[in-house]
From Swiss-Prot:
InterPro entries: Ubiquitin-like_Pup
Organism in which the protein naturally occurs: Arthrobacter sp. (strain FB24)
Function: Protein modifier that is covalently attached to lysine residues of substrate proteins, thereby targeting them for proteasomal degradation. The tagging system is termed pupylation.
Domain notes per entry: The N-terminal unstructured half of Pup provides a signal required to initiate unfolding and degradation by the proteasome but is not needed for pupylation, while the C-terminal helical half of Pup interacts with ARC to target proteins to the proteasome.
GO biological process, alphabetically ordered: modification-dependent protein catabolic process; proteasomal protein catabolic process; protein pupylation
Gene from which the chain derives: pup
Name of the protein in question: Prokaryotic ubiquitin-like protein Pup
Length: 67
């Protein structure tokens, strides 16, 4: 069917999402969120170092002397 566009019906769920009250995260979700934030912070720090001097960053992790 070349030249014909198919239109998909929009979900009615999106109309009701704003009306639903926000539920607080479960304790496990809060802990996972905190762990994720820590990882994100570490990755941001690594990105910053790589942007400034990638060669020095790599040298710091190269094993020297067969260790």
């Amino acid at each position: 069917m070349a030249g014909q566009e198919q239109q998909q019906p929009q979900s009615r769920e999106s109309e009701f999402e704003d009306d639903a009250p926000a539920t607080p995260p479960a304790p496990g979700e809060a802990q996972a969120s905190a762990a994720t934030q820590g990882v994100d912070d570490l990755l941001d720090e690594i990105d910053g170092v790589l942007e400034s001097n990638a060669e020095e960053f790599v040298r710091a992790f190269v094993q020297k002397g067969g260790q």
